[in-house]
């Protein structure tokens, strides 16, 4: 049962991060296409947003390890 819980935690964490990263990057590309002069600021904010979204799978892996080893 703990294997299933670990797999679900990692899978949903990766799914959420993939969707979130895709949305962030697509909106950034749209913004840069509209205002090329704001590209540097948008790119910086994009990397901050992607880093925050990537925290989700890391937390999911920790939860999966806790479920697997407890």
From Swiss-Prot:
InterPro entries: ATP_synth_csu_bac/chlpt, ATP_synth_F0_csu, ATP_synth_F0_csu_DDCD_BS, ATP_synth_F0_csu_sf, ATPase_proteolipid_c-like_dom, F/V-ATP_Csub_sf. It is a multi-pass membrane protein. Keywords: ATP synthesis, Cell membrane, CF(0), Hydrogen ion transport, Ion transport, Lipid-binding, Membrane, Transmembrane, Transmembrane helix, Transport. Disulfide bonds: none annotated. It holds the Pfam family ATP-synt_C. Gene3D superfamilies: F1F0 ATP synthase subunit C (1.20.20.10). It is found in: Cell membrane. The keyword Magnesium does not apply. GO terms for cellular component: plasma membrane; proton-transporting ATP synthase complex; proton-transporting two-sector ATPase complex, proton-transporting domain. Its main location: membrane. The keyword Nuclease does not apply. One of its GO terms (molecular function) is proton-transporting ATP synthase activity, rotational mechanism. The record marks 54 as: Reversibly protonated during proton transport. Belongs to the ATPase C chain family. F(1)F(0) ATP synthase produces ATP from ADP in the presence of a proton or sodium gradient. F-type ATPases consist of two structural domains, F(1) containing the extramembraneous catalytic core and F(0) containing the membrane proton channel, linked together by a central stalk and a peripheral stalk. During catalysis, ATP synthesis in the catalytic domain of F(1) is coupled via a rotary mechanism of the central stalk subunits to proton translocation. Key component of the F(0) channel; it plays a direct role in translocation across the membrane. A homomeric c-ring of between 10-14 subunits forms the central stalk rotor element with the F(1) delta and epsilon subunits. F-type ATPases have 2 components, F(1) - the catalytic core - and F(0) - the membrane proton channel. F(1) has five subunits: alpha(3), beta(3), gamma(1), delta(1), epsilon(1). F(0) has three main subunits: a(1), b(2) and c(10-14). The alpha and beta chains form an alternating ring which encloses part of the gamma chain. F(1) is attached to F(0) by a central stalk formed by the gamma and epsilon chains, while a peripheral stalk is formed by the delta and b chains. This is ATP synthase subunit c.
